[in-house]
Amino acid sequence: MGVAKVLIEVSPWLRDLPFVQLANNNISRYKMETSDGGASVHTVDDTWSTVNPTWEFREAALAILGDNISTDNFGELASGPENAMAVNIELKTKGVGQKFDQLAIYGQTTSTGFLAQTKNFKGLLRMIAEAESSTTTDLDGWLYTGDDSSANNKQVLMAASGASATLVLAMIDALVDSVRDKATHIVMSRLMRRKTNALARAAGNNLVHDKDQLGFPVTRYGEQVLFIDDQIRNNMDDSTLLVTAIASYDYEQAINASAKDTSPIFAVRMAEDGLTGMNGDGMIQVVELGELEGKDAKGKRIKFYCGERLTNKRAAAVLMNATFS
C-alpha cells in the first residue's frame, strides 16, 4: 500500500485538511485575519476614507515528523512472501499519521513533557489561545449559555465556570456558531463522540452516516463532518473560573473525576483562508539510505515536513470543561 494511502486511512486530519506548500524561506511567519474591516455607506460625491481589513502576524514553524527504519538482509530473505521493508514502511507511516493527529491538537500547548518541545508544530489549543494575542498561553473564554461580547477570547467556550459539566447538544451548537463563516468539521475524542451519538438518539435526531468523495465513511452533525481524533485525551484540567491554564496541562496525567476529566471539543473551518495544513517539498517522503554501515541491513528514511496554521482567528473554536457524565 502506498504511503499516501496509509496516511489518509490512519489520520482523519490528513484526509480532510487542505495543505499549502511553502516554497520560500519564510516558513514560520504568516498573517492571521482579525477583522474584515466591514464596509461604509456613501452618498453621491461623498468623502471616502480608507478602512482596511486588519491582520496580525503569527509564527508557525514546520516540524519534521519521521524516523529512519532498517530491514535486516537475512531477515528479509527469511520472511518468505512477506516484504519486510514494505511492512516497516507502512507501520512507520501510520506512526507519522498518529503523531500528526496528536500535534494537530496539543503541539506546543504545554510546558510539561514532550509536547513542550519547540520542534513540535503548534496545535489547535495553542493557536486558539493566540487568537487573543500572540503571547497568550491560556484559554480565557465565556460561558456557552451567555454572550461572547465581553469575552477576552470569543473562540473559547466553557461548559461551566470553574468546574466540569456533562456534555449537552446545546454546547455543540454554541461551539459551531462561534466559527465564521461556517464550521466544516467538529473534532472530538472517541468517548465524546459516543456521548454525542447518545444525545442525538435521545433527541430523535440521529447523526448522519455517509461516505466522502474518497469513499471513506463520515459522520455528520447537521452540516458539519464529525470526526474522531484518537490522540485527544479525556483528562484535561478543569478551568479556574473561565480560564484554562493549558501551559501546565500534563498529557500523561491520570483521569481524576474531581478535577481532570474533561475533553476539549473543536469546531473548525478547514480552508486555505481558515485552518490549513502546511507542508514543504511535497507530502510524506520515503528516502533510500541503501546499505547501512556496520550492519547487514538496508535502510530508508520516512519524513514529512508539516505544520498547521490558523489564517483567520474566527476559523476555529474550542469547548472546554465538558465531560462524558
Where are these regions (language model features)?
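Flexible, glycine/threonine- and acidic-rich loop/arm segments that mediate assembly and lattice contacts
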Residues: 1-241, 245-325
